[in-house]
Amino acid sequence: FISLMKVLPVPMRFAKPGARLLALIKPQFEAGREDVGKGGVVRDEAVRERVCRDVAAWLDGQGWAVQGLTTSPITGPEGNVEFLIAAQRAS
C-alpha cells in the first residue's frame, strides 16, 4: 500500500518534457488510516475527492499539468471507487 506521491518521483525524473502520465488513484493508498474503513474501502465521497485534489496538486507542484481526472470504470475488488488521472510534463 504505497501512495503515488511516494512511487512516482523516481520514474518521473526520467520523463522528457511533454511526456504524458496516466495513473490509477487508489484512495485507500492515499487516505490516512482513519479514513479507510473495514476491508480497506474508502466509503466517504469527501475523502475520495480530497485524495484526488491532493494528488492533482502534488502533480502540479512537480511540473505536471493535470489534463483529466475520471472515475475508473472498474472498481477495486472490495468495491473501492478508484480514479484515473492524466497529466503532461511541462515542455
Regions found by a protein language model. Give the residues of each.
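Conserved nucleotide-binding/hydrolysis micro-motifs of P-loop NTPases
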Residues: I2, Q28-A31, I74-T75
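Core SAM-dependent methyltransferase catalytic element
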Residues: I74-S91
